Amino acid sequence: MAQTQSPLQWLATTVIRGYQILISPLLGPRCRFNPTCSYYAIEAIKTHGTVKGSWFAMKRILKCHPLHPGGSDPVPPKNDRCNK
């Protein structure tokens, strides 16, 4: 079953997809993480919502620099406190 997105989630993921399609090919592969920062941002927004997902994405982008080793860095799972 597909999860419906809020209008803000749709807008954020559309902007990121626009970056992936229009800008990223011109820059070439630069991300040192797997998945790339843009895919991470989309997944974080879909998993955690726009505000928290954007926070995770911003922290990830700030780590994406030559002094960080990079590697595998998946989106953390959603902490659902009601089901504990």
Swiss-Prot record:
Membrane topology is: Peripheral membrane protein
GO-annotated cellular components:
plasma membrane
Q: Which domain of life does the protein's organism represent?
A: Bacteria
**Per the UniProt record, which residue ranges are transmembrane?**
none
Where in or outside the cell it occurs: the entry states: Cell inner membrane
Q: Which family does it belong to?
A: Belongs to the UPF0161 family.
Could you tell me what this protein is called?
A: Putative membrane protein insertion efficiency factor
